[in-house]
Swiss-Prot record:
Keywords: Cytoplasm, Hydrolase, RNA-binding, tRNA-binding. Its main location: cytoplasm. This is D-aminoacyl-tRNA deacylase. A Gly-cisPro motif from one monomer fits into the active site of the other monomer to allow specific chiral rejection of L-amino acids. Gene3D superfamilies: D-tyrosyl-tRNA(Tyr) deacylase.
Amino acid sequence: MRAVVQRVTRAKCTVDGAVTGETGPGLLVLLGVAPQDSADTARTLAAKLAKLRIFNDDAGKMNRSVQDIGGGVLSISQFTLFADTSRGNRPSFTGAASPKQGRELYAEFNAALRALGLPVGEGVFGAHMDIELVNDGPVTVTLDI
């Protein structure tokens, strides 16, 4: 499972002109699922993400988590995180999970974040989405579990 995590002051997902999810200060998470991933992988990543200290403390050091600041998460499924461009110029996505598995584990990941007390906005799995964000820092971290 792979997550590209961006610290944001706000982020919003829109599908066909309707807002499907948003957050104020917190995290935008682009989530990719691989064939070997499981519900346990999703829960492990959610726990890591909730405790990831990428928010500044009073001294300006990255020492606070999204839980510590009372922030939220906008979670977006993105199979393209497993693109392989090693052969030619057109990406291959054979490293990504099947749509069925991806949908199930995306839902499991979001449920695990909520179980940890985080408010979670969501994109729409498999849809063409417009994502707006204000990256704070910028701070962008990649997590592979």
